């Protein structure tokens, strides 16, 4: 009986201890790509994910191929957010930069908090969003709360 009482005490401590999420608000930079922190974070039920691409990626009429994916902690694909400017899923999309500012073109994606092609809502927890630009990957974490 003592063994179970000890396990119960540990479970109570783990479940009742508040979780603090500390995340740098500076964008993750990878040369020509900046992936910003989603906002709000933590969120429920939806969030916006900002990112910036250097105008160098668009020189001479080039169009970078961009994907944005959201994974759970088991590395399962949860969703592909939509580009806010067009509503198009960000899955191998060639982007245009019509109005660069300060050497960068700004974009944002929207995730409604649902699993891809489903009405099932994402559970509370940590998720990783990964931006892929011409094969270059940049990732950040976000938190869903219910």
Task: Please describe what each predicted stretch is.
Residues 67-71, 76-77:
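Beta-strand signatures of extracellular beta-sandwich domains
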Residues 53-55, 113, 133, 144:
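Hydrophobic beta-strand positions in extracellular immunoglobulin-like domains
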Residues 38-41, 51, 75, 111, ...:
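Terminal processing/anchoring signals of secreted or surface-associated proteins
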Residues 87-134:
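Short, surface-exposed loop/turn motifs with a glycine/proline- and acidic-biased composition
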Residues 25-39, 43-69, 83:
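Glycine-centered coil/turn sites that cap beta-strands in beta-rich domains
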Residues 2-30, 80, 89:
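Short, compositionally biased serine/threonine- and acidic-rich segments at solvent-exposed termini, linkers
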Residues 22-26, 35-36, 120, 124-146:
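C-terminal tail/sorting-segment detector
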């Amino acid at each position: 009986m003592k063994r179970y009482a000890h396990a119960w005490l540990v479970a109570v401590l783990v479940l009742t201890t508040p979780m603090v999420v500390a995340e740098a608000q500076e964008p993750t930079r990878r040369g020509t790509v900046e992936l910003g922190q989603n906002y709000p974070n933590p969120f429920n039920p939806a969030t916006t994910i900002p990112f910036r691409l250097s105008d160098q990626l668009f020189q001479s009429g080039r169009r970078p191929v961009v994907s944005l994916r959201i994974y759970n902690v088991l590395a399962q694909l949860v969703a592909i957010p939509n580009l806010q400017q067009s509503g198009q899923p960000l899955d191998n999309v060639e982007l245009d930069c019509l109005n660069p500012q300060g050497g960068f073109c700004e974009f944002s994606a929207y995730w409604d908090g649902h699993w891809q092609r489903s009405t099932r809502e994402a559970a509370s927890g940590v998720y990783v969003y990964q931006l892929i630009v011409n094969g270059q990957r940049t990732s950040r974490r976000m938190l869903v709360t219910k």
